[in-house]
Each structure stands twice: as structure tokens, then as C-alpha cells.
């Protein structure tokens, strides 16, 4: 592997292989069945009358390290929404970006924004 992107991809492939090994398709389908509402990212951007802004929620990056010391994804989401973000991009990759998949569900349960 020659660069960080290749390392991230390889790590994610390994993680997905473990998830597939430990969860049947039926189990995964049952988990997403309960997610009964979705916000359309594309429509939000296309239908926005002003400037569309995609705001990123990211605790760390492989190149810069820890970006936000007292990271609170819900507070960051609220700040972005209060400042007219059209959509939120939430990094969930754990090893390199220190994200968590739960961030998306938490934000989805608290705010109405793609």
C-alpha cells in the first residue's frame, strides 16, 4: 500500500468482511427496515433556492490527526443547521477518522436534514 487512501480502503474491506461474516443478509435487512424515513441529499441541494452547503462532521483525519478535542456530533450538527447547512456529511469510519456509525442515527433522530 502506497498511500493512506489505499490503507483506508483495505481496512474498510476487512471490516465489511467481518460484518458480512457475523451478520446474515436477513439480519441487516431487519436492522434497516426500522429506519422508516430518509432525507434525500440530492433533492435538498437541487431544490435549495440559495447556496447549497454540505457541512462535514469529522472528529479526526489521517493527515491532521484529532481536529476537535471536545467532539460532540449533535452540537456540531446543530451549529451547522443553525448556520443554514443544506446537508450534513457525517464521517463514520472509526480507525482513521474516529467516527461512529451511531453518529448518523443520533443526528437523524434529532434533526430533519439530509
Mark where each language-model region is.
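Active-site phosphate/pyrophosphate-handling residues
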Residues: 3, 75, 102
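Alpha-helical segments flanking ligand/cofactor-binding loops in enzyme cores
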Residues: 6, 77-78, 105
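Alpha-helix-loop-beta-strand connector modules within alpha/beta enzyme cores
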Residues: 38-43, 47-49, 99-114
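An N-cap/entry alpha-helix motif that binds or orients negatively charged groups
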Residues: 2-68
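Alpha/beta enzyme core
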Residues: 69-91, 110
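Glycine-rich, proline-tolerant flexible connector loops at the mouths of alpha/beta enzymes
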Residues: 26-33, 62-68, 87-107
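Hydrophobic faces of well-ordered beta-strands that scaffold small-molecule active sites
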Residues: 53-57, 88-90, 113
Amino acid at each position: 500500500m502506497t498511500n493512506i487512501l489505499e490503507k483506508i480502503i483495505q481496512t474498510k474491506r476487512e471490516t465489511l468482511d467481518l460484518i458480512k461474516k457475523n451478520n446474515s443478509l436477513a439480519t441487516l435487512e431487519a436492522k434497516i427496515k426500522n429506519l422508516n424515513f430518509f432525507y434525500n441529499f440530492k433533492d435538498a441541494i437541487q431544490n435549495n433556492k440559495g447556496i447549497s452547503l454540505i457541512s462535514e462532521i469529522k472528529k479526526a483525519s489521517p493527515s491532521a490527526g484529532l481536529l476537535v478535542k471536545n467532539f460532540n456530533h449533535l452540537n456540531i450538527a446543530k451549529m451547522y443547521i443553525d448556520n443554514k447547512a443544506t446537508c450534513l456529511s457525517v464521517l463514520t469510519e472509526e480507525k482513521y477518522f474516529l467516527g461512529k456509525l451511531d453518529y448518523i442515527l443520533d443526528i437523524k433522530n434529532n434533526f430533519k436534514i439530509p
